[in-house]
């Protein structure tokens, strides 16, 4: 194990400030506080980062007028490692495989619904909730045997106006929070990380500090097109699969039917949805 990695548990960032060649962090844990001088601060935070707010980094936000209902659900049949997505009248329903817990075949669900429907779902008893979810998902995994505690949060797209500054880079949801329709937020973040590592390695070879803007701008130049394509593709999918307009319903049905009959189109769509093209 590396002795150069220090894990701080139950620590909080109390303050952050820029300096000539990096970022200073004031960190607190219990009654202790100390200052860390970093050459590069990699801020991998949530979409509502207090550190970004303190640094004055604003975001571009777009609300989708949808809520995500999340929960762990047990099914009659095993998922065998397969993820499912259903496109309902109110939005997509994703069913994602989890490890088996005792004898339960568990999945995690992300159920996109309109705000009024989310209130109805949260107020439902388990019998009514199971029936409603079963009708939306179907019986591919048999009957639903149990639904865990429900969580609910509004869905929106949030993009940081700045992802890099001298000595600072934003990664993950703090840089770009996407609608879960294509499940690409995590994949995009992993590609961002890979690209950042390559830029830092190149800077190291050239004798340039990792927080230097030449290194960070190289990273941004590499990733900007990837980010733009995934963000745009995801946003268009939301519009297409959350609309009840007759023209878009027809396009949606025709498109999904075409994917079944033309394997090349299906493969191309899948690669696009995964952010690989």
Regions found by a protein language model. Name each.
Residues 26, 30-35, 40-150:
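Conserved FAD-binding catalytic core of PHBH/FMO-like flavoproteins
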Residues 18-22, 79, 189:
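Pyridoxal 5′-phosphate
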